[in-house]
A protein has these predicted regions:
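Short amphipathic alpha-helix segments
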Residues: 4-23
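Short hydrophobic/aromatic beta-strand micro-patches
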Residues: 4-6, 35-38
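Short Gly/Ser/Thr- and Asp/Glu-enriched loop/turn motifs at secondary-structure junctions
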Residues: 27-32
Length: 62
């Protein structure tokens, strides 16, 4: 699953958050992260991330 961030400055923060919940994110480039996780699990993590960082827009791409 690809995660695209509107503001690439959040890339490292989101990657660190995903690592903190046991994921292994791969930063492809600023603003783009790849994560191999079940959709439901990733959706739950991103809901928490959005609460913590409401100004950061994240888009999912399959």
């Amino acid at each position: 699953m690809q995660l695209l961030l509107r503001d690439p400055e959040y890339t490292d923060r989101l990657a660190a958050f995903l690592r903190s919940v046991g994921q292994r994110p791969l930063v492809r480039e600023p603003g783009q992260i790849e994560v191999d996780a079940p959709d439901e699990e990733l959706d739950a993590y991103l809901r928490v991330w959005i609460v913590l960082h409401p100004e950061a827009h994240v888009e999912l791409q399959a």
